[in-house]
Curated annotation (Swiss-Prot):
Keyword Heme carried by entry: yes
Database matches in InterPro entries: Trp/Indoleamine_2_3_dOase-like, Trp_2-3-dOase_bac, Trp_2_3_dOase
Catalytic activity: L-tryptophan + O2 = N-formyl-L-kynurenine
Protein name stated in the entry: Tryptophan 2,3-dioxygenase
Residues reported to bind substrate: 55-59, 117, 121, 258
GO biological process, one term: L-tryptophan catabolic process to kynurenine
Family designation: Belongs to the tryptophan 2,3-dioxygenase family.
Pathway: Amino-acid degradation; L-tryptophan degradation via kynurenine pathway; L-kynurenine from L-tryptophan: step 1/2
Enzyme Commission number(s) from the entry: 1.13.11.11
Length: 286
């Protein structure tokens, strides 16, 4: 018997197949389709420190995931407006996994020690994750509205205009509340026609509507499932927020952030913000 390790035809190798395309002089390649030349040349460290490349790539990839999450949430809002719950549920599942991916990215960044980070922190200037418009878009789409937070984007007219538009439109939860009303559950006008530029505040009529859904889950099963999937989104988002705060605390302690915030204490305040407050409150009353 011939030992397979001594036979290059059967050993630890894989030969090219004749059918595999190798000439892309006149065809679009993988790199062309993904614009990899631009993507992979978009890392410009401001120092000679090795670990700055890690810092840049983690944040760039996070921005891509945030862009995808924002795109999916736009689609989900449209699905909810149309009463298309089956597709909305599919999108929610995808957004949840995107948020899980973002949460895991903090584990990689946490390999950056305080000593490593201090070697290039000054090179960041005043740039900060607080200025991420991808993140701000998601916060606004989910209902955490605050007009003051788009001031940092006034230097970018296109971004500022997009965020202003999202600020003024109903959030995902606003659209869900409208669905409750359309399906015959009584909702106060103050919740249906509120100032959408303001952060959502819990409303007793909305709480009572959700209580009716949960107490009659078989009768309102789509709404019941929608509510639980919204809880999935908030749970995943809160885990991302917490992991962000903890990674920052691990690396810089209680120093001020590069963008001028109080740092960890500022991030901790976000943990008290709920996108869908009645969905948590109702559990107390069941």
């Amino acid at each position: 018997m011939v030992c397979p390790h001594n036979n290059p035809k059967q050993g630890n190798t894989r030969e090219m197949e004749d059918s595999i395309h190798t000439d892309f002089n006149n065809d679009m390649s993988y790199g062309d389709y993904l614009c990899l030349e631009q993507v992979l040349s978009a890392q410009h460290p401001q120092s000679e420190v090795h670990d700055e490349m890690l810092f840049i790539i983690i944040h760039q990839t996070s921005e891509l995931w945030l862009k995808l999450a924002g795109n999916e949430l736009d689609t989900m809002i449209h699905n909810v407006q149309q009463g298309d719950f089956s597709h909305a549920f599919k999108v929610i599942s995808r957004v949840k996994q995107i948020l899980n991916q973002l949460t895991q990215s903090w584990n990689i960044l946490s390999t950056l020690t305080p000593v490593d980070y201090l070697k290039f922190r000054d090179a960041l200037g005043r740039s900060s994750g607080f200025q991420s418009y991808g993140y701000r878009k998601i916060e606004f789409l989910l209902g955490n509205k605050n007009a003051d937070l788009i001031q940092v984007h006034e230097s970018n007219e296109q971004v500022h205009s997009e965020l202003q538009g999202i600020l003024e439109r109903p959030s995902l939860y606003d659209e869900v509340i409208r669905v409750l009303h359309k399906q015959g559950l009584p909702i106060d006008d103050s919740a249906l026609n509120r100032d959408f530029t303001q952060p959502y505040q819990a409303n007793e009529s909305v709480l009572n509507a959700w209580l009716s859904v949960y107490r009659n889950a078989d009768e309102h099963f789509e709404l019941y499932e929608l509510a639980e999937k919204l809880i999935d989104i908030e749970d995943a988002f809160q885990q991302w927020r917490f992991k962000h705060m903890y990674a920052v605390q691990r690396i810089i302690g209680n120093k001020m952030g590069t963008g001028g915030s109080s740092g960890v204490s500022f991030l901790k305040k976000a943990l008290d913000i709920s996108f869908f407050p009645e969905l948590f409150e109702l559990r107390t009353h069941l």
